[in-house]
């Protein structure tokens, strides 16, 4: 399927406080964020024109920047308003929302404390890609070569651009080998997450998922755990060794893009997508639908 290059699209991007035409949203090639990874971002989705968990994402966006030793010069409320504006201005109902912040081009060295902090928000069309029955076939995951870093070595709780380098490498390798994605281990060889989503397993009716201490405790992950508990499903957060995968019944991943997606294989391990996966696919789909007051607020923009 042909995908229109992102630099050739139309619409508006919010950049440093103002809406600008898509093709005018540019940064200098000597921006510090490009060379030294002083950059963080968010991944969000709008359903029916309303951004799901917008405030939680804005709060994490600012926290991520603080962990990278810079401050986003907008409040949570200003970021929420800017995101809603750019969704409405582009006329999307179901779309992906990408806030990003980076150090600018005033300084080009490891230290760049006087570089301007730039912020942009872009959106693009992103409908739900699969129906429930298609999802229930499950995807296949490779096991990544690279591991999530020790929290003593990197700000693992930040959605920092630099931390995605090994994710890109791992997903490229997985796709070349015929897989949809890759499961990553942590620095001690235990199960961690996928390249852009959290991973959960089911055994004897309970969900088991790794403790989120060296990777993002995803907003979707938190939502899905809450939904599982609300439906009477026990959730156990613990250390999981790779060899334990042989004993799990179901496996699924969750994230902004993935939503809730069952897994049929992780390397040599096989799973059968089942009722808990189905229940959470349906519960999450209901949870993301905007309420009447949210729709009214979006219309008033």
Q: Where in the sequence are the language-model features?
A:
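Helix-start/capping segments and mature chain N-termini
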Residues: 1-85, 110-301
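Short, acidic/charged, Gly/Pro-enriched secondary-structure junctions
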Residues: 79-107, 124
């Amino acid at each position: 399927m042909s995908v229109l290059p992102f630099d050739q699209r139309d619409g508006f991007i919010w950049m440093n406080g103002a809406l600008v035409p898509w093709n005018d949203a540019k940064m200098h090639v000597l921006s510090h964020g490009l060379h030294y990874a002083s950059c963080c971002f968010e991944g969000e989705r709008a359903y029916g024109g309303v951004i799901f968990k917008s405030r939680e994402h804005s709060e994490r966006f600012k926290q991520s920047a603080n962990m990278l030793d810079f401050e986003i010069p907008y409040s949570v409320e200003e970021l929420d308003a800017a995101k809603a504006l750019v969704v409405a201005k582009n006329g999307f109902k179901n779309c992906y929302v990408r806030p990003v912040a980076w150090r600018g081009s005033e300084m080009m060295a490891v230290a760049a404390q006087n570089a301007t902090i730039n912020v942009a928000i872009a959106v693009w069309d992103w409908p739900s890609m699969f129906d429930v029955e298609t999802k229930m076939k499950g995807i296949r995951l490779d096991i990544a070569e690279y591991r999530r870093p020790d929290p003593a070595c990197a700000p693992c709780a930040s959605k920092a651009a630099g931390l995605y380098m090994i994710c890109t490498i791992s997903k490229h390798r997985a796709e070349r080998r015929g897989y949809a994605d890759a499961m990553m281990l942590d620095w001690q060889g235990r199960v961690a997450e996928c390249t852009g989503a959290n991973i959960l397993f089911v055994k004897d009716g309970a969900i088991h998922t790794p403790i989120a201490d060296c990777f993002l405790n995803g907003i979707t992950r938190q939502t899905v755990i809450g939904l599982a508990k609300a439906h009477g499903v026990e959730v156990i957060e613990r250390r999981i060794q790779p060899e334990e995968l042989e004993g799990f019944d179901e496996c699924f991943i969750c994230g902004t893009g993935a939503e809730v997606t069952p897994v049929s294989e992780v390397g040599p391990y096989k799973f059968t997508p089942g009722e808990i996966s189905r229940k959470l696919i349906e519960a999450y789909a209901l949870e993301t639908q905007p309420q009447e007051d949210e729709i009214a607020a979006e219309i008033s923009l």
